Structures are given as structure tokens and as C-alpha cells.
């Protein structure tokens, strides 16, 4: 042992920069921990000196006890942070109040309406209940039906498939059980009648169109009308999932315009939803404006796959109405007709179209007692999927006339029924007449009242018919036209022929009332040189019965499942129809 120590000492003297290696004898003679650390660090100056002052209690002998070493643990804050449970947000489901057990705790002992938020104290693991109170009415009426929410919000621990937005939380807070609250409030006032009470009015925001659904008890023709806000612009109607404001509407392109209105394609920026916006100039009379707003409220409650969806409307201070509705990317039928092969609608498309129009008319009348009053190609739209939808229908003459102001009176009167022109009482059967006239135009490619009664086959007649089929402006005639030929002058207009001057308008109205109803029976298609479909001709003849007492209603016509509408509901023509609609969409682009 002595020799080994001597050899180590000699080896250490060779390196003068390092202190000698301590021997076991020196360690045993100096048991001080500081000396021990100094000896093990070899006395290096850059070695960080460890302080053992903050260590656990030393023993009397100066050495550390093993029990004290086990008591050295990490800080409490880190331990609590690691042991904190993930946040939990308890929200009642939509059906929890009626059928299922509610997930929220009902608190009825508080004197004010409150919502409890559970949080952890930063210093300990105890959960502290924090309450956000609402001011209650005087008298300390207890509240009930409020939800207890645990909102230790942390996006890391929220299930992305079950994310609850802030709007939903606000809706849960605002849509409280007012009936239960009023019952408890009344019971508390009866038992504490000596306490002073203060009547508080609940403030409600009224939009220009009510978003509520119509009930069977109240008639849609007699809605509850609220007073309009006194502002330069009435607010746009809102639905449960969509809120419209003028500042959120971005115009993409103009779809059409007229003397009294325009239609444009817009984008609703918050939802990135494409819509169609129609601006219509109306009368400045407040009575008419109020009537139009009332009707727009009713239109907002119409929900059918055959009716254009109505998003909302607002009344501007410059006597214009802005209507936001569903956008159909294929446009109206008068714009689709020139894109069709031979400028005629195929028979299977006419079957789908007739079924959609009659179904839409049936829904409007049976559910809301609404008559369209303006069935024509301009007011029937089609989507890229081949869905046909009715638009621009009203409840009264004020709205119907306002919506039709962009078109000429002749264009609308061409499709009027005889009883309506004569000023007689008319109903939904008047729309059936208009449907029959429109089917003739779409099947033949020629407006209904363009042919002369005498059926003259001279070159001038053929030339006029060719101009009508091509949708171009009629050629100018040299010299004076005879009175019998004045009604043969055509204009491109909005896809139909118009009669120039008051005499032409009166001539048109007299023809509708006095002449026989138009028909395709026993006629040859000028393009295919073949007769028209037999069932199509029979269906059109049923629609164009001049005596409205004999003419069928839309739902009566839909009952014929064995002839014209055979296979329509079963989807026999769906594949062929969708392929045709896809071609039309490509032509539009």
C-alpha cells in the first residue's frame, strides 16, 4: 500500500499544472464534504462551486442522510401543471331540455342568474368555482334553468370533431327557458309580495323579414307585422344560419338589367356563398312599401325544392328593394332556349320541367295560399344539376307588379289567362294556363302568338318565323305594313315577341280572349319534320282550356301518372336529363 501511494505521488509530480491526487489517507483524515468536493474537482478554478446550504438538514456528524436526499422533489407548480386534467365543456344538447337528461347542472339557489366556470387554483389542485352573474330584476327573484359550464379553454385538448363555437355558446346562453323563468318569478312574487318589483322589458331585434317558421294555427296571409326600424335602411332578413349585411355582399358580375331593376351575381363574404341580388325600384308610398315588406316575410317562409330559396331583403332609402336569393348558374329558361339543340327543349326535359312547375305551384297554394301570377320562361331558373325552380312570385299585385317592372307589360301579358285579362276572378288555374303557353314556346322554339290565324305560307311569313326562331330583331320592311301584318313585327326583347304600340297591345289581348287556345296537336315540328309527342300535346291542351271552371288545378294534373308524367317520379329520365343539363352548363361557360 505504501509503495502504491508513493508511485501515484511521483506520477502526479510530473504534471506540475495539476494538484496531486489525494490519497485515501488524506480523505479519511478530512471528512468535510466541502473538502471532499474540492479534492474531487482537483482544485480547478473553472469548476463551479456547489453550495450545500440549501440542501436538506445535515446530521450532526456533517454527512447527508439518505432520507433527506429522497425528499428533494421538483417544484409544486410543475407537478400541478402535469397533473391538470383536460378542460371539459358541458353544454346541453338541443333535445336535452325535452327528451334526454340535461348535461348541465340546474342551479336554483342563486339570487341572480349565473353561469359557473370551473378553474383550478394556481397554487393547489383544488378546483375553484367562479361565477359570472347577470343583473336580475329587483326583489332577488331566484333563477332556474341555467347551465353550469366548465370552460378551462385549451385548443390543444378540444376534440376537433366536437368543437363548440363561441356563437353556439352565446346561443345557449340567450336561448334560456323563459317559460320556466317566468313561472318561478311569478311564484316567487306571490310568496314575497311585500318585496318591490320592477317590470323589465325584454329587448328584441326585429329584422325586415321574420325568420320564424309558420305555424298551422296562423294563416301565412296574415302574419304578425312588427314596426320597421326608423333608419335610412331596413335591415336585411336573417335566417338561423345566415346573416346578411350590405357591407358583406361583393358584386361579381351583372346578370341583367332593365328600366326599373337589375340582377347581379354576388358573394357573401363571411360564408363564401354565391347569391343572386335583385334591385327593384318601387313606389315611394309608405303603404306599398309596407305591403311589400309584409309579403317578403311570407316568401321567406317558403321552403321547397321547386321554389327558389329566399335569403333576405332590405328596403333602401332611395325607394329600392334589395332581394337576395339563391343563385342558379344555368340561368332562366329564356336564356337556355337558344343554347338547346335545334333551339328546342327535348320532350324528356319538358316532362321534368312540367312536373317541377306544377309541384311548385301546388306547394305555394296549398301551404301558403300564394298564386304566382307571372309564370313565363324568365321566371323559371335551372341549376347545373337540372333542377327547375320558380322565382319572382308574390302575394299581392303590388309586389307582382314591382318584380315585373324590369320586363315590358306585353311580355307579361302574353302569358296571361283570358279570365285575368277580362278582369274576372282568377286563381291558381291562371298559372296553369301560363304553363301551357310556356311549354308550347319551349317545345317549338317559337313564341305562342307569333303565327297568323290565316296561316299564310308566303315568303314573308317564313322570313318572320325564321327571325323569331333565331331570337334576332325583325327585318325592316320597306313601305307601310298593312294593319293585318302589324302584329307580325318582332323584337328580340327578352326572348319573346312584342307588339309595337298600344294598338299592338290591344290586338294581343283581343286574340287571347277571342281566339281559340293555341295547340300543338296535329302539327309538325318545323325542325325535325316529325309530329310532336302525343302525350305532350294532350297535356298542353289540358292546360289551355279557356273555361277556367273546366281547367284542372296543378295537383289534379299531377295525378296523371300513366301518360305524360309516367316514369318521372321513378327517375326514368334522370340520367338523360342530368347529361343534358351538363351540356347546357358548358355552353353557358
Curated annotation (Swiss-Prot):
The active site is at 374 (proton acceptor). Gene3D superfamilies: Phosphorylase Kinase, domain 1, Transferase(Phosphotransferase) domain 1. PANTHER family: DUAL SPECIFICITY MITOGEN-ACTIVATED PROTEIN KINASE KINASE DSOR1-LIKE PROTEIN (PTHR47448), SERINE_THREONINE-PROTEIN KINASE STE7 HOMOLOG (PTHR47448:SF1). Transmembrane segments: none annotated. Pfam families: Pkinase (PF00069). Keywords: ATP-binding, Kinase, Nucleotide-binding, Phosphoprotein, Serine/threonine-protein kinase, Transferase. GO terms for molecular function: ATP binding; MAP kinase kinase activity; protein serine kinase activity; protein serine/threonine kinase activity; protein tyrosine kinase activity. Residues 249-565 form the Protein kinase domain. ATP binds at residues 255-263, 278. It comes from Candida albicans (strain WO-1). The keyword rRNA processing does not apply. Belongs to the protein kinase superfamily. STE Ser/Thr protein kinase family. MAP kinase kinase subfamily. Residues 24-33, 92-121, 206-220 have a biased composition (Low complexity). Residues 1-162, 185-232, 473-499 are annotated as: Disordered. It catalyses: L-seryl-[protein] + ATP = O-phospho-L-seryl-[protein] + ADP + H(+); L-threonyl-[protein] + ATP = O-phospho-L-threonyl-[protein] + ADP + H(+); L-tyrosyl-[protein] + ATP = O-phospho-L-tyrosyl-[protein] + ADP + H(+). This is Serine/threonine-protein kinase STE7 homolog. Residues 57-69, 127-136, 144-162 have a biased composition (Polar residues). It is an enzyme of class 2 (transferase). Residues 185-203 have a biased composition (Basic residues). Its EC number is 2.7.12.2. One of its GO terms (biological process) is filamentous growth. Residues 1-18 have a biased composition (Basic and acidic residues). The modification Phosphoserine is found at residue 402.
Amino acid at each position: 500500500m505504501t509503495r502504491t501511494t508513493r508511485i501515484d505521488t511521483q506520477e502526479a509530480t510530473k504534471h506540475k499544472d495539476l494538484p496531486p491526487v489525494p490519497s485515501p489517507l488524506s480523505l479519511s483524515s478530512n471528512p468535510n464534504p466541502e473538502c471532499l468536493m474540492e479534492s474531487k474537482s482537483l482544485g480547478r478554478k473553472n469548476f463551479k462551486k456547489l453550495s450545500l446550504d440549501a440542501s436538506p438538514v445535515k446530521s450532526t456528524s456533517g454527512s447527508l442522510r439518505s432520507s433527506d436526499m429522497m425528499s428533494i422533489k421538483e417544484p409544486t407548480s410543475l407537478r400541478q401543471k402535469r397533473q391538470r386534467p383536460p378542460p371539459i365543456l358541458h353544454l346541453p344538447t338541443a333535445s336535452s331540455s325535452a327528451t334526454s337528461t340535461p348535461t348541465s347542472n340546474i342551479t336554483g339557489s342563486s339570487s341572480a342568474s349565473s353561469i359557473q366556470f370551473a378553474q383550478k387554483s394556481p397554487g393547489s389542485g383544488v378546483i375553484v368555482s367562479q361565477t359570472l352573474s347577470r343583473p336580475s330584476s329587483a326583489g332577488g327573484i331566484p333563477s332556474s334553468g341555467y347551465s353550469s359550464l366548465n370552460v378551462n379553454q385549451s385548443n390543444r385538448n378540444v376534440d376537433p370533431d366536437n368543437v363548440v363555437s363561441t356563437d353556439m355558446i352565446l346561443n345557449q346562453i340567450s336561448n334560456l327557458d323563459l317559460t320556466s323563468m317566468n313561472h318561478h318569478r311569478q311564484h316567487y312574487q306571490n310568496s314575497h309580495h311585500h318585496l318591490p318589483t320592477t317590470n323589465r322589458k325584454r329587448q328584441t331585434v326585429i329584422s325586415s323579414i321574420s325568420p320564424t317558421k309558420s305555424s298551422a294555427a296562423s294563416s301565412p296571409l296574415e302574419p304578425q307585422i312588427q314596426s320597421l326600424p326608423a333608419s335610412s335602411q331596413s335591415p336585411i332578413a336573417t335566417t338561423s344560419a345566415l346573416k346578411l349585411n350590405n357591407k358583406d355582399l361583393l358584386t361579381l358580375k351583372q346578370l341583367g338589367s332593365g328600366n326599373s331593376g337589375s340582377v347581379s351575381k354576388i358573394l357573401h363574404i363571411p360564408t363564401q356563398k354565391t347569391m343572386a341580388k335583385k334591385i327593384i325600384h318601387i313606389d315611394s308610398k309608405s303603404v306599398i312599401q309596407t305591403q311589400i315588406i309584409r309579403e317578403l316575410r311570407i316568401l321567406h317562409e317558403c321552403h321547397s325544392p321547386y321554389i327558389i330559396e329566399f335569403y333576405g331583403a332590405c328596403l333602401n332609402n332611395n325607394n329600392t328593394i334589395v332581394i337576395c336569393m339563391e343563385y342558379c348558374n344555368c340561368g332562366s329558361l329564356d336564356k337556355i332556349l337558344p343554347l338547346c339543340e335545334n333551339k328546342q327543349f327535348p320532350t324528356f326535359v319538358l316532362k321534368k320541367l312540367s312536373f317541377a312547375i306544377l309541384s311548385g305551384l301546388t306547394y305555394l297554394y296549398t301551404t301558403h295560399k300564394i298564386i304566382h301570377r307571372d309564370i313565363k320562361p324568365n321566371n323559371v331558373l335551372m341549376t347545373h344539376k337540372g333542377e327547375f325552380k320558380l322565382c319572382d312570385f308574390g302575394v299581392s299585385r303590388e309586389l307582382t307588379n314591382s318584380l315585373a317592372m324590369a320586363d315590358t307589360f306585353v311580355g307579361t301579358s302574353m302569358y296571361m289567362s283570358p279570365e285575368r285579362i277580362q278582369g274576372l276572378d282568377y286563381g291558381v288555374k291562371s298559372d296553369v294556363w301560363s304553363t301551357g303557353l310556356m311549354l308550347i314556346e319551349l317545345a317549338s322554339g317559337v313564341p305562342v302568338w307569333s303565327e297568323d290565324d290565316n296561316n299564310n305560307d308566303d315568303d314573308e311569313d317564313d322570313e318572320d318565323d325564321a327571325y323569331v326562331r333565331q331570337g334576332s330583331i325583325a327585318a325592316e320592311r320597306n313601305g307601310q305594313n298593312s294593319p293585318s301584318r302589324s302584329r307580325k313585327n318582332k323584337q328580340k326583347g327578352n326572348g319573346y315577341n312584342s307588339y309595337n304600340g298600344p294598338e299592338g297591345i290591344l290586338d294581343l289581348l283581343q286574340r287571347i280572349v277571342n281566339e281559340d287556345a293555341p295547340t300543338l296537336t296535329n302539327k309538325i315540328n318545323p325542325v325535325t319534320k316529325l309530329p310532336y309527342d302525343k302525350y305532350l300535346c294532350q297535356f298542353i291542351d289540358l292546360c289551355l282550356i279557356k273555361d277556367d271552371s273546366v281547367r284542372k288545378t296543378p295537383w289534379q294534373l299531377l295525378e296523371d301518372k300513366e301518360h305524360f308524367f309516367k316514369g318521372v317520379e321513378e327517375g326514368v329520365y334522370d340520367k338523360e336529363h342530368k347529361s343534358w343539363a351538363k351540356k347546357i352548363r358548358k355552353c353557358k361557360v
